[in-house]
Amino acid sequence: MRNPLLQPWLTEKSTRLTEQQGQYAFMVKAAADKTDIKRAIEEKFGVEVRSVRTANCLGKSKRQYTRKGLIAGKKNDWKKAVITLKQGQEINYYSGSTDQGEEKKSKKG
């Protein structure tokens, strides 16, 4: 698989896991397996992964009431991966984002 990582999964629970236990949560492609996820994390962030836990999350069912009646639908299913890193390593999600904003402001002025 080319790149199984979609985006970091940032919630209160995942932030608490990161601060207390050094675990990071990511939304990944549904077809990704643990070895693909581990390889992608190590290549992208340059860290050593100790373990990977995955969970398949079902999409919520949605209903919309219209003049023509009830329209039922469903959000897409997705997969969540929780990564545990080796002791003393961390991932910075926001590296470089503030530098680009300052460069754009200085060019306009």
Curated annotation (Swiss-Prot):
Keywords: Ribonucleoprotein, Ribosomal protein, RNA-binding, rRNA-binding
Transmembrane helix keyword on record: no
GO biological process: translation
InterPro entries: Nucleotide-bd_a/b_plait_sf, Ribosomal_uL23-like, Ribosomal_uL23/eL15/eS24_sf
Keyword Electron transport tagged: no
SUPFAM superfamilies: Ribosomal proteins S24e, L23 and L15e
Molecular function GO terms recorded: rRNA binding; structural constituent of ribosome
Annotated transmembrane regions: none
One GO CC annotation: ribosome
Superkingdom of source: Bacteria
Family: Belongs to the universal ribosomal protein uL23 family.
Quaternary structure and interacting proteins, as annotated: Part of the 50S ribosomal subunit. Contacts protein L29, and trigger factor when it is bound to the ribosome.
Protein role: One of the early assembly proteins it binds 23S rRNA. One of the proteins that surrounds the polypeptide exit tunnel on the outside of the ribosome. Forms the main docking site for trigger factor binding to the ribosome.
NCBIfam families in UniProt: PRK05738.2-4
The name this protein goes by in its record: Large ribosomal subunit protein uL23
Gene assigned in the entry: rplW
